[in-house]
């Protein structure tokens, strides 16, 4: 009984994956790839602002910029991107997905903890979360005013 259920679930997942890969606009993958490459390149360049053992300003800038732009694009979707969903995916999933980095943020927090930089850790975590939410909200409001 469990094998039959598992087999049915796997077939269903495979069907959905096949549908996504082959029956959806395949150009969106190209646009996401290009957006991802550009976002990764910008993320790499911004990372030079980080210093060894210092405050990770590059990661903070990348993540806060990404939060603002994601909010802005979310609000602008109805007005500007409804006819261009592929472009929206290229920017959000590709560019912003590659630009922002939650995993690096977490690793930097662990590094600060290991080096007993508790004040810096607290400042970085609170700044990232509070300003990330705030900038995303500002982006949504600004985008709503533009649309």
Swiss-Prot record:
Regulation of its function: Na(+) is not transported, but it plays an essential structural role and its presence is essential for fluoride channel function.
Reply yes or no: does the keyword Transmembrane helix apply: yes
Q: Which residues cross the membrane?
A: 29-49, 61-81, 90-110, 118-138
Where mainly found?
Answer: membrane
**Binding annotation for Na(+):** 97, 100
Reactions that this protein is recorded to catalyse: fluoride(in) = fluoride(out)
Which GO molecular function annotations are given, in alphabetical order? Answer: fluoride channel activity; metal ion binding
This chain's source organism reads: Staphylococcus aureus (strain Mu50 / ATCC 700699)
Domain of life from the UniProt record: Bacteria
Query: InterPro entries, per this entry?
Result: FluC (IPR003691)
Q: How is this protein named in the record?
A: Fluoride-specific ion channel FluC 1
The role this protein plays is: Fluoride-specific ion channel. Important for reducing fluoride concentration in the cell, thus reducing its toxicity.
- State the Pfam families in the record: CRCB (PF02537)
What family does the database annotate?
Answer: Belongs to the fluoride channel Fluc/FEX (TC 1.A.43) family.
């Amino acid at each position: 009984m469990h094998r039959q259920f598992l087999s049915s679930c796997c077939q269903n997942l495979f069907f959905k994956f096949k549908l996504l890969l082959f029956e959806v606009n395949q150009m969106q993958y190209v646009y996401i790839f290009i957006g991802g490459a550009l976002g990764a390149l910008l993320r790499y360049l911004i990372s030079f602002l980080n210093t060894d053992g210092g405050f990770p300003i590059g990661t903070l800038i990348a993540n806060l910029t990404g939060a603002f732009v994601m909010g802005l694009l979310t609000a602008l979707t109805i007005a500007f991107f409804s006819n261009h969903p592929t472009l929206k995916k290229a920017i959000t999933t590709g560019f912003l997905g590659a630009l922002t980095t939650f995993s690096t943020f977490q690793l930097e927090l662990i590094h600060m903890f290991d080096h007993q930089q508790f004040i810096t850790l607290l400042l970085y975590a609170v700044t990232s979360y509070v300003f990330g939410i705030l900038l995303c909200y500002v982006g949504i409001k600004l985008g709503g005013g533009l649309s």
